[in-house]
Amino acid sequence: MAADDHFSLFGLPTRFALDPVQLEQAWRAVAARVHPDRYATASAAERRVAMQWAARANEAYRQLRDPMLRARYLCEQAGVDLQTESNTAMDPAFLMQQMEWREMLDDARRDPAAFAALRAELEQARLRMQQTLSELIDERGDYQQAGTKVREWMFVEKLAQELSAAQPMQ
């Protein structure tokens, strides 16, 4: 078994928009072929190789199943350095949106209605990010701009985690 990237490992087209059912079926097929139990009577070297392939298949599936991780993977495969730790430059409109969401998060800690409103708004932001990334990657092949959107999406996910951890005070 040889595969240069996660998509070819599963025999899928290299694109952002993926059918999750097709992805899962492809993962199950690969996982069944390389499952270590199939190599129980094989040599130690063959068992080790099977274990490595199983781990690789699981990691590839984890990254492709999550739309944000998939977008990040595609950008990195295209040679885009996302500089997630050092590049904080973002669109001014998105920076304003961040500030607004931060204020909403403060309100959400005290108000169940604000909590629900912010959760819904972040879910809509996720959907918009997915649509934008599908267009940037699959239609335009603009991985640089997609990288910028991935960094924005990472902020949205971080804020969503903070929101989940925040419980409105009664």
From Swiss-Prot:
InterPro entries tied to this protein: DnaJ_domain, HscB, HscB_C_sf, HscB_oligo_C, J_dom_sf
Family matches, as Gene3D superfamilies: DnaJ domain (1.10.287.110), HscB, C-terminal domain (1.20.1280.20)
Pfam families: HSCB_C (PF07743)
Entry GO terms, CC: iron-sulfur cluster transfer complex
Residues annotated as domain J: 5-79
Keywords: Chaperone
Entry keyword Chaperone: yes
UniProt GO MF annotations: ATPase activator activity; protein-folding chaperone binding
SUPFAM superfamilies: Chaperone J-domain, HSC20 (HSCB), C-terminal oligomerisation domain
PROSITE patterns: DNAJ_2
GO BP: [2Fe-2S] cluster assembly; protein complex oligomerization; protein folding
Subunit-structure text: Interacts with HscA and stimulates its ATPase activity.
Function: Co-chaperone involved in the maturation of iron-sulfur cluster-containing proteins. Seems to help targeting proteins to be folded toward HscA.
Assigned protein family: Belongs to the HscB family.
HAMAP family to which the protein is assigned, alphabetical: HscB
Name of protein: Co-chaperone protein HscB homolog
Naturally occurring in which organism (per UniProt): Bordetella pertussis (strain Tohama I / ATCC BAA-589 / NCTC 13251)
